[in-house]
Amino acid sequence: AVNGLVVPMKLLIATRNPHKLAEIRALFVLPGLTIVGADAFGGLPDVVEDGSSFQANGVKKAVTLALRARCWTLADDSGLEVEALNGEPGVQSARYAGEPPDTSANNAKLLRALESVEQRAARFVCVVALSSPGGRAQIVEGVCPGRILRESRGTKGFGYDPMFVPDGYRLSFAEMDAALKNTISHRARALQRALRTWRDVLAGDAADWPAIRKPRLPAEAEG
């Protein structure tokens, strides 16, 4: 807000996934903020998520689309990390069973991988990246710990939701009402942190991040 007026601001969400867009819209509520998905802009590329971490993928998506659309852009990369599988499926969560992405095949593969495993601790991780129109990005992270079930439960949600019960609850993500899931999920936690961290930037129509004046010598000039 400037002088008490709400400045309209457009925020591009780097996704064509209607579930994800709806979840972000429900959480990211600020006066004057208009949220649009990638389909609302013509000619935006599909960004190849080839990073080795959620952080790398989130930043790549946010920066690529921000530069193309010349608009503040929010991207997330998220997935499931299973302790007994050394963090798999991790960044491969959407394509765990191969191409094209297939939720049923992914869930079936996960059940097979954990068939004889008693220790079923897991966590959903979400990294949210926000890029300025000029391509400078910052990130925040949200984590939801829980465990993997021995069978699918529930029909709500998407992805691995029917397989995952968050710590402190008896219902799987796919059995929960959206209102509850949108309070405790990894994406909810990351977006809540994003709101707290970036509220001032998103409340105005800034062209870039506020300047942080820290003089830094180039590495080759030191010593």
Give the ranges of each region predicted by the language model.
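N-terminal amphipathic/basic-hydrophobic helices that include classical n-h-c signal peptides
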Residues: 1-8, 222
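Anionic-ligand binding patches
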Residues: 10-12, 18-223
